[in-house]
Amino acid sequence: MKSKILLIGIDGLNLDTGLENAPTLVALKEKGFFTPITIEPPTWSGPSWSTILTGAKHSQHGVFDNSFTGHKLLHHPDLLSRAYYQDQSTTTFAAAGWPPLVDPIGHGPIIHERREQAKALRHRVLVRDGETYGYTHVDAEIAAAAQYAISHHGPDVSFVYFCGVDEAGHAFGSIGDEYRGAIARIDAYLDNLLQAVQARASQEEPWLVVVTTDHGHIDEGGHGGDSAKERASFVVAHGVGRKNPLWPQSFEPHQLVDLLLAERA
């Protein structure tokens, strides 16, 4: 049976700051595959997530900031779309509170709309607006919807995104209690999602749970530059009901998509 893939994006996570507040992520890191990766500058969410989710470099997808001006994303399908094109029995799910990732109205989206598959219930998308309503509230909605989707639909390939950590980093810096508290909150959501995956895996469904981030933060909060802290990212991958992936110990952010698709081949 093909592995089901759950890719979780935690925006703006400094791994060296928050691990003591993230027991679920620590456990995944210790039991699974782990490697640090280095983000191509500029370290904004737009270009970084475009690269991570499509496998195209900045110069290819044309996203260089969060305005998405002049982007070429239509020519670079995302992970979920490519998984479907690879096998048209594939079901996909995406949930995010940062609209450019999933909202067809406005900037982007990085995750293609795929209306025909959506009508056929093969592609489900939850769009929320954390920029307007705040990510503390929106991330909770995203987590609940993703847990429901995993438990009741078991999509073959999913992308679930949280931005509360990044929001706290901008507002309070990345070394204070507020940032650590946001990490703890997202880690609790991660635990809920993992429990849903484990329940599915107990029915002989193999799952691969992958966690990554798009950039780090400087201590006082902020990113966009080319410092080591801003460019620091990672990939954690843990097999549930299957072995951990045999991936190279060093790779570039744009190579993650192909590694994930190979797990579905």
Question: Model segments located where?
Answer:
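Feature captures the catalytic ectodomains and active-site-proximal regions of enzymes
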Residues: 1-265
